[in-house]
Amino acid sequence: QKPSLTSLVLVGAADAAGPYARLEAIAGGVARTRTLVSEPPNILYPESFVDKALDLAGLGVELIVLDDAEMKRLGMGALLGVAQGSVRPARLLAMRWNGTGRDDVKPVVFVGKGVTFDTGGISLKPAAGMEDMKWDMGGSAAVTGAMHALAARKAKA
């Protein structure tokens, strides 16, 4: 069956560019979060998680990435202890969006757990449900999506 509608014209609608851009930014953040939490751990690991966030710099998000050496220097033993269960090196990603352009305003802070796959150590977690441990990074995915939404819509926060 051939489509019978070839064009559509909306009459009387106000300019929707402004509201659309805001909603597009929010939808982009939600989509980013969904994509991150859907990736399997052989695709999404600490380094690739950081790589998938680097494009936020183009939206004006400041990215700070800590590697193993920097975390050790800062005394982040608990995080490094968890990371020892993987052949992949650890990463910690911090993101900053300053929509006010001022440094004297107290920030709003989001913290999200970003363990890309948590086995809990050798034999500490039962095998049943182990595949669900990829969602231990859902908090960091949500924060990454929120930063995308804030920066893409140029939020004043």
What are these regions (language model features)?
Residues 1-116, 149-153:
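N-terminal hydrophobic/helix-forming segments and targeting peptides
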Residues 53, 108-110, 124-157:
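Alpha-helical metal-binding/catalytic segments enriched in His/Glu/Asp
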Residues 117-124:
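Short acidic/His/Gly/Ser-rich catalytic and metal-binding motifs that mark active-site loops
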